[in-house]
């Protein structure tokens, strides 16, 4: 499974279960012959959600992909502010985590 496919599955699942979810693209854009950095927060999660009134950020990691230092700092800032941060590696483990925390 690709990260793109897993991201779409998670967003659809959250929406079908009454939550709000959106994909956040934090990549540089090509303008003319040069790339311009995004103005998003460095390390932001791939999916931002509100589930049962809670702020949830989900980072999608497939295979050997790991969090960058910026993503680890972002996770710390979300959790210290009372938000929920989850690293999704596959849909089955996400589904289990979701049911443990929101059902």
What are these regions (language model features)?
Residues 1-103:
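Catalytic phosphate/metal-binding cores of nucleic-acid and nucleotide-processing enzymes, i.e., regions
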């Amino acid at each position: 499974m690709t990260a793109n496919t897993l991201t779409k599955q998670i967003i659809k699942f959250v929406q079908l279960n009454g939550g709000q979810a959106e994909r956040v693209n934090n990549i540089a854009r090509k303008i003319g012959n040069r790339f311009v950095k995004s103005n998003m927060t460095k390390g932001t999660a791939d999916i931002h959600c509100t589930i049962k009134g809670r702020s949830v950020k989900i980072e999608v990691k497939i295979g050997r992909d790991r969090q960058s230092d910026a993503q680890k700092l972002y996770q710390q800032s979300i959790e210290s502010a009372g938000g929920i941060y989850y690293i999704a590696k596959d849909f089955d483990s996400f589904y289990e985590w979701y049911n443990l925390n929101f059902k």
